[in-house]
Amino acid sequence: MQDFEEALDRIVAGLEKKNRVMNPTERKFVAYHEAGHALVAEMRKNADRVTKVSIIPRGIAALGYTQQSPTEDRYLMRRSELLDRLDVLLAGRVAEQLVFEDVSTGAENDLQRATDLARHMVTHYGMSEALGLVTYDARPAPLFLNGPTLPEPRTFSERTAEAIDGEVRRLLDEARDRVTQTLRTNRGTLEALAALLLEKEVVDRTMLDGLMAATAAPAQLRVAAVALPPGDGGS
């Protein structure tokens, strides 16, 4: 069983980097970062189930990771699910800011993925009330048949481009605000999970269930992310 789990970890997060030794400050940042991801995932009813949290460096750049597994096959994603996914992606960065009043470069991939997701919600899926049921998709067009592609000229105005950027920012800002509220409300659980990670380095599902129960933040208290009206959240 241990060999199977190690093989799965290699597939999900890459090879363990035993020569990548973090200093104490880095370990604390990574522990709170991953604890933030895991805790917010536990508190969002549409988020995938957390199966493991680790602060063991793996792969090319990962200093830690939160492993999630869907409970069922999915062929489409609802808006509520995408909003919860935004929350989980931003939770590591928000945890750093909340605890240390500082942030690190560790959230780079999270921020890129969150930005891409928010932009797709606005430009591909018609999930912006401000812009309506319109897609703004500049798909690359082949230069020659089966040849390299070139971006198509933008088919919308500069004003629309600014509106798209504004909606993307709004979605991200609102997600940040929701996550900040969740982590502040459950600060004790965040601290306990980070401490457990610093002690054990890996927290599995059983350990997480025990911690959530002991800190009065059971998984059944999960709440869905609720979108704020346009213009009410963030800057």
Stretches found by the model and what they are:
Residues 1-6, 10-29, 125-133:
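C-terminal helical "lid" subdomain and adjoining coupling/linker elements of P-loop NTPases
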Residues 25-32, 38-235:
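Soluble catalytic regions of large protease machineries
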